[in-house]
């Protein structure tokens, strides 16, 4: 267990953030979660959040004791100041800068800043996020350098010693599935597979081996490929 007492986990209801909640529950005495409603097209992720949290409590009695308050924050202003495939009903395409139009400029910067403010009020020393720059779509606000710079800025701006943890930063999606198995065994893998949501289009009609989704958006492709590689390694 970490020497830090408490952590606040950015929890969307997806695979990565659910894995991060379990990771934090293994390390910290007190864990709270925070989610953001920013007018996302795949708002179904917000709908599954309460069920995922309840299931995490059921998987491990110790997790139930540690898991505290869930904070839901309205950041609908993001959809008002951005024009992306994450907040608008438009086709997912690549932009001239090489990024998919699912990139929401400043989103993770704003998420972390708001989360740091909540952590300050709640007396929590650690922020945990599922950012990753191995299996990812190239978003610049998911990079390790961005998170390190943001940690410095937040601590300077609030005179704190807040730590930003990104346990998935240097692992691929197959390793993320393996981390979930190591943390919570088959029950956690099954919960992530059937209970969480990642698909950018909000598709929850068909349950695939890797979970629900359209199977063609960047998020589904990463999740499906990661699960296939994970399953192959487990045989």
From Swiss-Prot:
One of its GO terms (biological process) is queuosine biosynthetic process. Gene3D superfamilies: HUPs. Its EC number is 6.3.4.20. One of its GO terms (molecular function) is ATP binding. Its cofactor is Zn(2+). The keyword ATP-binding applies. Keywords: ATP-binding, Ligase, Metal-binding, Nucleotide-binding, Queuosine biosynthesis, Zinc. The keyword ATP-binding applies. It catalyses: 7-carboxy-7-deazaguanine + NH4(+) + ATP = 7-cyano-7-deazaguanine + ADP + phosphate + H2O + H(+). Signal peptide: none annotated. Pfam families: QueC (PF06508). Pathway: Purine metabolism; 7-cyano-7-deazaguanine biosynthesis. Catalyzes the ATP-dependent conversion of 7-carboxy-7-deazaguanine (CDG) to 7-cyano-7-deazaguanine (preQ(0)). Belongs to the QueC family. PANTHER family: 7-CYANO-7-DEAZAGUANINE SYNTHASE. NCBIfam families: 7-cyano-7-deazaguanine synthase QueC. This is 7-cyano-7-deazaguanine synthase. It comes from Janthinobacterium sp. (strain Marseille). The gene is queC.
């Amino acid at each position: 267990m970490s020497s830090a007492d408490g952590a606040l986990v950015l929890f969307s209801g997806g695979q990565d953030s659910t894995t991060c909640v379990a990771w934090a529950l293994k390390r910290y005495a007190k864990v709270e979660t925070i989610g953001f409603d920013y007018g996302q097209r795949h708002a179904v992720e917000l709908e599954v959040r309460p069920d995922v949290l309840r299931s995490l409590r059921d998987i491990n009695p110790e997790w139930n004791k540690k898991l505290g308050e869930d904070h839901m924050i309205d950041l609908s202003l993001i959809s008002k100041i951005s024009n992306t495939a994450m907040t608008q009903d438009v086709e997912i395409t690549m932009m001239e800068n090489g990024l998919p139009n699912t990139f929401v400029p400043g989103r993770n910067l704003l998420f972390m800043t708001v989360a740091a403010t909540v952590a300050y009020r709640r007396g929590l020393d650690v922020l945990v996020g599922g950012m990753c720059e191995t299996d990812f779509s190239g978003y610049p606000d998911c990079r390790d350098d961005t998170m390190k710079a943001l940690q410095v800025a937040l601590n300077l701006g609030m005179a704190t010693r807040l730590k930003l943890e990104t346990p998935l930063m240097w692992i691929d999606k197959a390793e993320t599935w393996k981390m979930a198995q190591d943390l919570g065994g088959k029950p956690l893998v099954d919960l992530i597979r059937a209970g969480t949501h990642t698909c950018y289009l909000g598709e929850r009609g068909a349950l695939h081996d890797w979970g629900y989704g359209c199977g063609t958006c960047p998020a589904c492709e990463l999740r499906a490929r990661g699960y296939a590689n994970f399953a192959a390694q487990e045989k």
